[in-house]
Design a protein with these regions (language model features):
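Alpha-helix-loop-beta-strand connector modules within alpha/beta enzyme cores
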Residues: 1-4, 58, 283-297
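Hydrophobic faces of well-ordered beta-strands that scaffold small-molecule active sites
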Residues: 2-6, 33-37, 102-105, 123-126, ...
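Active-site mouth loops of central-metabolism enzymes
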Residues: 5-16, 98-108, 162-165, 235-246
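Flexible, glycine-rich active-site loops centered on histidine and acidic residues
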Residues: 9-78, 122-125, 129-131, 138, ...
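Flexible loop/turn segments at secondary-structure boundaries
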Residues: 10-12, 43-44, 112, 131-133, ...
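Short, acidic/polar
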Residues: 18-21, 106-114, 247-255
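Conserved, mostly hydrophobic/aromatic
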Residues: 25, 66, 102, 116, ...
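An alpha-helical appendage that flanks or caps ligand/catalytic pockets
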Residues: 53-93, 131-261, 294-319
Length: 319
């Protein structure tokens, strides 16, 4: 599969173009595309001169429009609050029917978890430690129950920074490169720490005690968060797993046992890692780690969306 996690829906002035691009990739690849939708953070809003106060509303309308463009024979007209098309008749339609699978990455926003669960879209936690991720998954399950279905492993996924080396010592040495790298205008120094005043623009996210998961809210209040923790702390919390194959497999087993996600995503080759660092890890990942993790998943009874009939594309269609 080719998972795009994900496109920044609220920032597209012409989401019809986006719908056709993804449809074309789905045709060319023979139905391999997984389409992820994200809202983006404050940095993206600043870069694209986008109003953060309407980000969430634009996200939802753009999503409904793209799904309709994929599933409704044209021509049709769309007159929404933010999007206006007199004539919609896509020349490219997805290979997969009714549309490519939609997965929703998120980082502790209650609104995003709730919305994903209401639409029965798999939710992929891309930030936060294991405790915060479990709280998010439990909330997804709670919302699913309120909407008439029981969520399971196929509805949740987790992104973890994973790097593999021949030895644990080498893994520890290279893994520290996650916390360094080239600077950019939106980071404090060159240690990859997001400037909170840019990331959390006024109006971008709902305010109040229920806007974020409890652990995330407490971290934000203390200017904490995984990105501001030391390397040792992130390793302790399983936000980074960087070691030899056996230790990486053991760490991933703990993650799988604790969270029970049906899908896992590995974040490698970041920070100041070199091309050689990435290629060594990629080789060991494919030869030793992934086969072992798949067996652990089978042992724990973890299934992904593609292993459950009817769960691939979800059940949502726009009205």
């Amino acid at each position: 599969k080719i998972a795009i996690l994900g496109n920044l829906l609220p920032l597209w002035d012409d989401p019809l173009w986006l719908a056709e691009q993804i449809a074309m990739m789905d045709m060319i690849s023979g139905g391999r595309i997984v389409s992820g939708w994200v809202r983006g953070g404050g940095r993206e809003s600043v870069s694209h001169n986008s109003n953060p106060t309407i980000n969430w509303d634009r996200y939802q309308e753009a999503h409904d429009f793209v799904v309709k463009a994929w599933t409704t024979p044209g021509p049709f007209r769309w007159e929404g609050k933010y999007l206006h098309y007199r004539y919609v008749n896509p020349w490219a339609l997805p290979y997969q029917k009714p549309h490519p699978p939609i997965w929703i990455p998120g980082a502790a926003s209650r609104a995003t978890v709730k919305w994903a669960s209401e639409h029965r879209y798999p939710y992929v936690m891309i930030g936060g430690d294991l405790a915060l991720t479990r709280i998010s998954f439990d909330y997804y399950k709670e919302v699913a129950s309120e909407n008439g279905y029981q969520s399971s492993t196929q509805h949740v996924g987790k992104l973890v920074k994973v790097h593999v080396e021949d030895t644990d010592e080498k893994g520890d040495q290279v893994g520290r490169k996650y916390l360094s790298g080239v600077s950019n205008p939106f980071l404090d120094g060159n240690e990859g720490i997001v400037n909170l005043s840019i990331q959390n623009l006024p109006g971008l996210s709902p305010r109040g005690g229920n806007a974020r998961m409890p652990v995330a809210a407490s971290l934000a209040a203390g200017r904490g968060g995984v990105g501001r923790q030391s390397y040792e702390a992130q390793v302790q919390h399983y936000s980074i797993i960087s070691a030899g194959p056996k230790k990486v497999i053991a760490g991933m087993r703990h993650v799988l046992e604790y969270l029970r996600p049906g899908s896992m995503f590995f974040w490698d080759g970041d920070g100041s890692m070199t091309h050689d660092d990435q290629m060594r890890s990629l080789r060991l990942m494919g030869q030793e780690v992934l086969p072992a993790i798949r067996e652990v998943g089978k042992e724990l009874g973890l299934v992904g969306p593609y292993e459950v009939p009817g769960e691939v594309t979800g059940t949502y269609l726009p009205k």
